[in-house]
């Protein structure tokens, strides 16, 4: 993996490509860099596995093709976002702010995937407990963000020492997933958890945007939230935020499907009785 990244960086720094020279990586400890990188790859791999697992009763060739397409699309997204950050093309001070554009594209992509037929397939083909449990990635992620704050990469308000309480989503995801696995009918608990997770996610997204070096900046303490324009930190919005948004949308759709199924059940049971009378 290190060799692959080095080759990509070398390619991007080739003057014949007419790209900017590679920007220096924001100073961070090797442990933080590789734990961040590893978690992003794990989340990407989990998405591909989920696509394959949700194939259900489709033919083997169709399931294989869908999995390969998901893997190719995911790998392309990872490579493009990393390459853009490594090439220095992402910035919050340019007009338009290219880093902000990328974040907006990521959010739009997440909503598109979550509300698509693929999102519906994930909602119906993956157990609710698993859909909730995968959001536990936000616990180690928040530990990394706190470490990033301690190392001077990002402002305090984006960590749990400030106003970011999303670590509660990651911790509670484990508990709620285990509870749902034992009591599949406890959808009210899942509904409350999902709503709370969305609120906490919206909170940190708002704080992050208002901490960027743009005209709408509200938090003026240093450093500004511009580290996500660098590699590999660009994967914070491009991978982790996207995964969180897709996850919440898919869980919402799963809960809606189950609510509709419960509404239809009494009517289906009453139909034979009415016919017999």
Over which residues does each language-model region extend?
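Short, intrinsically disordered terminal tails adjacent to the first/last structured region
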Residues: 1-15, 263-277
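Hydrophobic transmembrane alpha-helical segments in integral membrane proteins
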Residues: 6, 18-44, 91-103, 234
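Hydrophobic cores of alpha-helical transmembrane segments in multi-pass inner/ER membrane proteins
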Residues: 37-47, 103-117, 168-177, 235-253
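Membrane-interface helix-boundary motifs at transmembrane edges
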Residues: 55-66, 90-93, 118-127, 181-190
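A glycine-rich, hydrophobic loop/mini-helix early in the fold
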Residues: 76-147
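Membrane-proximal helix-loop-helix units in multi-pass membrane proteins
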Residues: 118-186
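Hydrophobic alpha-helical membrane-insertion segments
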Residues: 192-207
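Short, membrane-exposed interhelical loops at transmembrane-helix boundaries
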Residues: 214-234
């Amino acid at each position: 993996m290190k060799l692959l990244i080095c080759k990509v960086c070398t390619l991007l720094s080739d003057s014949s490509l007419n790209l900017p020279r590679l920007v220096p990586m924001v100073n961070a400890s090797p442990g933080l860099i590789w734990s961040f990188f590893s978690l992003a790859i794990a989340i990407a791999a989990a998405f591909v596995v989920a696509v394959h697992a949700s194939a259900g009763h489709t033919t083997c060739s169709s399931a294989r093709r869908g999995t390969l397409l998901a893997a190719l699309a995911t790998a392309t997204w990872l490579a493009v976002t990393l390459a853009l950050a490594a090439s220095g093309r992402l910035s919050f001070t340019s007009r338009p702010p290219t880093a902000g554009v990328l974040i907006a594209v990521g959010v739009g992509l997440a909503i598109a995937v979550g509300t698509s037929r693929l999102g519906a397939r994930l909602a119906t083909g993956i157990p609710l407990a698993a859909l909730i449990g995968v959001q536990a990635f936000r616990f180690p992620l928040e530990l990394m963000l706190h470490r990033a704050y301690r190392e001077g990469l990002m402002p305090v308000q984006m960590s749990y020492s400030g106003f970011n309480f999303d670590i509660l989503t990651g911790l509670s995801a484990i508990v709620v997933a285990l509870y749902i696995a034992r009591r599949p009918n406890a959808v009210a608990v899942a509904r409350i958890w999902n709503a709370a997770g969305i609120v906490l996610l919206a909170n940190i997204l708002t704080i992050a945007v208002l901490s960027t070096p743009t005209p709408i900046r509200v938090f003026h303490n240093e450093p500004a939230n511009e580290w996500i324009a660098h590699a590999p930190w660009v994967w914070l919005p491009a991978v982790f935020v996207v995964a969180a948004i897709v996850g919440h949308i898919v869980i919402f759709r799963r809960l809606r499907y189950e609510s509709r199924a419960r509404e239809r059940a009494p009517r289906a049971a009453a139909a034979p009785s009415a016919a017999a009378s």
